[in-house]
């Protein structure tokens, strides 16, 4: 009886890939974050409380978020990745509560400290 073929090898992990990403929620608000492993299922550490305020229980039953890679590097240091993330937060104004869910750096017009 012929031997069954070996299963395909899993896709290689981009374990060394640093990325800065943008999450877009159904209401159009965004969150900018970084991931130093480029995990396929990591969607950031935005405040659950802040996001939940913007959605009704019915809206929370089914929704879609989008994750876009804005920048990537195999060689950037942690501080370089953090600097790029900071620059994208300011560029996209995702720290403005009307625009996004980033809490840092504090938005100048928000009164937050």
Give the ranges of each region predicted by the language model.
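Structure-specific nucleic-acid interaction/processing domains
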Residues: 2-113
């Amino acid at each position: 009886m012929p031997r069954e073929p070996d299963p395909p090898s899993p896709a290689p992990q981009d374990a060394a890939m640093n990325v800065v990403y943008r999450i877009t929620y159904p209401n159009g608000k965004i969150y900018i974050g970084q991931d130093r492993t480029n995990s396929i299922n990591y969607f950031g550490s935005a405040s659950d409380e802040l996001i939940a305020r913007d959605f009704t229980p019915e809206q929370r039953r089914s929704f879609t978020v989008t994750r876009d890679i804005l920048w990537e590097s195999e060689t950037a240091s942690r501080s370089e990745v953090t600097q790029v993330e900071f620059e994208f937060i300011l560029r996209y104004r995702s720290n403005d509560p009307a625009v996004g869910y980033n809490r840092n750096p504090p938005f100048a017009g928000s009164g937050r400290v």
